[in-house]
Amino acid sequence: MFQKILIANRGEIALRVQRACRELGVKAVMVYSEADREAKYIKLADEAVCIGPAASPLSYLNMPAIIAAAEVTDAEAIHPGYGFLSENADFAERVEKSGFQFIGPTADSIRIMGDKVSAKQAMIKAGVPCVPGSEGELPDDPVQIKRIAKSVGYPVIIKAAGGGGGRGMRVVHTEAALINAVAMTKAEAGTAFGNPAVYMEKYLQNPRHIEIQILADKHKNAVYLGERDCSMQRRHQKVIEEAPAPGIPRKLIEKIGERCAAACKKINYRGAGTCEFLYENGEFYCIEMNTRVQVEHPVTEYITGIDIVKTQIMVAAGLKLPFTQRDIQVRGHSIECRVNAEDPFKFIPSPGRITMWHAPGGPGVRVDSHAYTNYYVPPNYDSMIGKIIVHGDTRDQALARMRTALDETLVEGINTNIPLHRELMVDAKFIAGGTNIHYLEEWLAAHKR
């Protein structure tokens, strides 16, 4: 096991990894920007190193500064968290070339899965079903593009090969709009991701977003930890996640889970990963694989009893997975609400000082947050300041616990989206379960403030 790990991230995930290190008896080095200097988790760190000013490119995306911090503190490994450099293959490569262990997959795995075209090809090869579409990057010839769209069938969606986080995609309903949409997506992709390549997929009208959590070690062992339903989204950004997915037969989940685990063995994957699917009419279609820990990992931890972050660290240290597929049992139901510092209905970010922070408690309630009374939420980063996660024996009990937890939560000084969550937890369609990925946006349009 490592003696010391550097955590190359901020906020709630930095604190989450710090806690995992403490449990494993590993020293944690935190890096921070000038905007995060006063954060409590920085003050609680074994060691902390300032890596630059508030702007992300000069701090949390600054590879030389992060690697230098690992060198001066004698860390042995670097955990990237999620976001920032977590899915940057060049960073993973530089970390390992500098003599540190990257707590995540190899740079090659990240490269394959980070490019949506090569990821899709790898998944198809491993027998994982994918959304019908162009089997690779779209050509430049407009005639060929139109031919591909015709064979796939409208509506289609144009996606950036290097995209992610819900950016770099465009839905096209008619041939007349096709070529312009491809050109615009290419231009955007080149600017945003440094890669203008785009591909085409059939646009599913009313799918659900279901993902399979994978853990794999360096000894060709890979398991799946059930599924999560992340269909409650706004602008392709997840708002509420739950596990297991309501109303999907276990046999279907087992079949797709086994295929995902087999695919990971085939490509010598290591660490935590998530295969994301669109699910419609009883069919799963793989859309991408995330090569990092997910924001919503706690719902899976709750239903399986497996600590995903600790396991990430253990397999990076060369240990075998301490469990087999047979050991993994799904128990009860878990729901997570992301708490964002923003207007709950207009979604305008609300940075500033939290004058009062009171987190909920009680049986089956977990709060993952770096916030506290008098904490200043900087305007420089993502608006998420925490997550409320609940677990119950049944989905109904989990919903009841979440309603109570949201009512108990008190945040003053800034706006948060907690009022939105309170309303969604009593919404009849959400309570019934199985809403599709468009439901939240339709709900918001019908409940305009």
Q: Each predicted region: which residue ranges?
A:
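ATP-binding N-terminal substructure of ATP-dependent carboxylate-amine bond-forming enzymes
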Residues: 1-126, 138-147, 397
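ATP-dependent carboxylate activation and anion-phosphoryl transfer catalytic cores
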Residues: 7-23, 48, 71-73, 96, ...
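A short acidic, helix-capping loop that chelates divalent metal ions and anchors anionic groups
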Residues: 166-168
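Conserved, charged catalytic cores of large soluble enzymes
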Residues: 172
